[in-house]
């Protein structure tokens, strides 16, 4: 990735659109802290986050494969990022319940990922990215594994939820229709 200068206002839904190999996911990985920028600064709210480890950046992430822990229940998957942040059990339980309600999955907290459909897994991955109330959520082609009908439904749901919560989203896709449907800016 060369000469990227990007400013994203709070609450914007920005999509990075391009073909495979164009650097979209690399940009997300640098924002998340999983890859290191060789030059320049990555700033969040005016503060450089270049030397801050991924788990301390306060950034939510939804991957294409959802990255849910198969040995954990839905509630345990959502609670994990809160445990890493050392929140008390009562606070974790409250935040997990709120996040599950946000994605209309409140009745699924005791299930394991293998017991969920692709769309349900996608909602749980989204809830996990939002459970700790991040300022920024990164999404790397999260709808790629879904069928057309469910993908279109989830496009609407993700966009509506992001705007309702006022969160900033950086979304990666190679699908032009998806980008134009969901984004404030492409």
Where do the language-model regions lie?
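Conserved H-loop
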Residues: 64, 166-172, 174-175
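A short, surface-exposed alpha-helical micro-motif characterized by mixed small hydrophobic
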Residues: 179-181
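ABC family nucleotide-binding domain
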Residues: 1-148
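Helical segment within the ABC ATPase nucleotide-binding domain
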Residues: 152-165
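Short alpha-helix of the ABC ATPase nucleotide-binding domain corresponding to the H-loop/switch region
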Residues: 148-155, 176
């Amino acid at each position: 990735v060369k000469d990227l200068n990007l400013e994203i206002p709070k609450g914007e839904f920005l999509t990075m659109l391009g073909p495979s190999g164009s650097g979209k996911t690399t940009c997300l990985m640098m924002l998340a802290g999983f890859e290191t920028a060789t030059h320049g600064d990555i700033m969040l709210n005016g503060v450089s986050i270049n030397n801050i480890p991924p788990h301390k950046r306060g950034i939510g992430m939804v991957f294409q494969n959802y990255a849910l822990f198969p040995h954990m229940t839905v509630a345990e998957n959502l609670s994990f990022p809160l445990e890493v942040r050392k929140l008390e059990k009562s606070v974790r339980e409250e935040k997990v319940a709120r996040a599950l309600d946000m994605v209309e999955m409140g009745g699924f907290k005791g299930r394991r990922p293998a017991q969920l459909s692709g769309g349900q897994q996608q909602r749980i991955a989204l809830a996990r990215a939002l459970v700790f109330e991040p300022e920024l959520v990164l999404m790397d082609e999260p709808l790629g594994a879904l069928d057309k009908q469910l993908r279109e439904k989830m496009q609407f749901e993700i966009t509506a939820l992001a705007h309702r919560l006022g969160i900033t989203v950086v979304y990666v896709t190679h699908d032009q229709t998806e980008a134009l449907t969901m984004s404030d800016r492409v």
